[in-house]
Amino acid sequence: MTILAIAAAAWILLHLLVAGALRPAIAGRIGENAFRGLFSVLSAISLGFLIWAYRGTPFVPLWDLGIGAVHMAKLLVFIACFLLVGSLTPRNPNLAGAELVLKDTLPAEGLIRVTRHPMLWAFTFWAIAHLLANGNLAALLLFGAILVVALNGMYSIDRKQHRRHGAAWDAFAAQTSLVPFLAIAQGRNRFVFREYGLARVIIACALFLILMYGHGYVIGRDVTG
């Protein structure tokens, strides 16, 4: 369990410190592109270490929320699939070049109308789902670490984009929201289904089925029941 705790701490500190407070100094010395490449490699290594440590950790039960929590977990994964697929769009300034997207008067479209961080919300719901369905210490360390990084990432990206793009980012942020559907509820935007598209709905549903039926083969635990 100690190794898993170290791996979880390393994963969190990598994202909170290296991608946070230390990023300007490091990127200033090696360049932004080199930093992105280095951080991607370090993230992959850290995630691999985290997963490896998790698989070798003994089972220590903490809670059992019953079958209702399992069904809720499946619903959250289903929603996460739609968020993940919807985030993979060239109109997402957090994935594509923000300068190209933010130059438009109305850059928020598709799922970005719902939240400006659909991918990180997908990881958030995915992590919560696994915490609901796996009430043990190892799961808490693994999925808790992923949850912390995903939630912190939303605020970190907002701060970073504001520093880089100033008024252009503020205008974009005013059209959307960090919390899903908040901008729509406040009348600052509206959801347009055709911008999400039937193709993405089909892909999201297919992804969910692949995750459900492939879970037993890859992870060794059947979740289709």
Each PLM stretch: what is its role?
Residues 160-195:
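Membrane-proximal soluble regions of multi-pass membrane proteins
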Residues 39-112:
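Portal/gating segments that form or line small-molecule/metal binding sites
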Residues 209-225:
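Juxtamembrane boundary at the C-terminal end of a transmembrane helix
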Residues 112-167:
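A contiguous pocket-lining binding segment that forms or flanks enzyme active sites
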Residues 4-6, 37, 72-74, 78, ...:
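Hydrophobic alpha-helical transmembrane segments
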Residues 16-35:
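Membrane-interface helix-loop junction between the first two transmembrane segments
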Residues 107-119, 183-204:
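Loop-to-transmembrane boundary segments
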Residues 1-13:
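Hydrophobic transmembrane alpha-helical segments in integral membrane proteins
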